[in-house]
Amino acid sequence: MSFIVIIPARYESSRLLGKPLMDIQGKPMVEWTWMQAKKSGATRVVIATESDRVKAVCESFGAEVCLTSERHESGTERIAEVASLLGLNDDDILVNVQGDEPLLPPDLIHQVAEGLETHPNTLMATLCEPILDVETVFDPHAVKVIRDCNNYALNFTRAPMPWSRDTFGSEPKTLPGNWPYRRHIGLYAYRSGFVKRYVEWPVCALEQVEKLEQLRVLWHGEKILVLDALCEAGVGVDTEQDLIKVRKIMANLNPDGAL
């Protein structure tokens, strides 16, 4: 199977300025993510950034880098520009690995690409994992996904959804026993031709409110396949607290700085 990993790495992050270059065990965060992507079986790994500074750092550790516009609303928009700049074929499978996922298992990158390849009529695929505690359901940084009976997404939201009337209405809140809550893993596979279509659609109101790029796809009536992840996704870095947590994890796993 042939697929290309593209890693959006935005220096001007709204929550953590310079996030791709933040140090973890002597390497910038984006380098750890790139190293994981290189182990996934991808035929090519490209880092996409709007920053000359990020570009220079990434090229220094041997990565292929594509300099993109500063005006993109999302990683998928940045990937569409890369597909155009590199002249990728419409049938090429692209995997969007966010640059703030230094612990993302390579097996999950391969899984989402394979999921798209084995569903030829599907335009976009992603992954999810079980939510085991009620705190995560109420955490706005944990995106919840609801699927239909064929594992296609009905909705993605930061809100506690679905709302359990019986167990969320009083304290202490508990998870209901009759619903499998799922956390979305922000990893996408799509064909190059589809991302070119994606950027032609206007940003939708729901996407703007939730700040979730995948909602544009559902808004325009297309489907997203959501597969159960084969293993735990690891901790991504959205906040300063996440960064502290990841540094502790990697210091314990990698006292010599090697993942």
Curated annotation (Swiss-Prot):
SUPFAM superfamilies: Nucleotide-diphospho-sugar transferases. GO terms for cellular component: cytosol. Pathway: Nucleotide-sugar biosynthesis; CMP-3-deoxy-D-manno-octulosonate biosynthesis; CMP-3-deoxy-D-manno-octulosonate from 3-deoxy-D-manno-octulosonate and CTP: step 1/1; Bacterial outer membrane biogenesis; lipopolysaccharide biosynthesis. It is found in: Cytoplasm. GO terms for biological process: CMP-keto-3-deoxy-D-manno-octulosonic acid biosynthetic process; lipopolysaccharide biosynthetic process. Keywords: Cytoplasm, Lipopolysaccharide biosynthesis, Nucleotidyltransferase, Transferase. InterPro entries: Cytidylyl_trans (IPR003329), KdsB (IPR004528), Nucleotide-diphossugar_trans (IPR029044). PANTHER family: 3-DEOXY-MANNO-OCTULOSONATE CYTIDYLYLTRANSFERASE, 3-DEOXY-MANNO-OCTULOSONATE CYTIDYLYLTRANSFERASE, MITOCHONDRIAL. This is 3-deoxy-manno-octulosonate cytidylyltransferase 1. It comes from Hydrogenovibrio crunogenus (strain DSM 25203 / XCL-2).
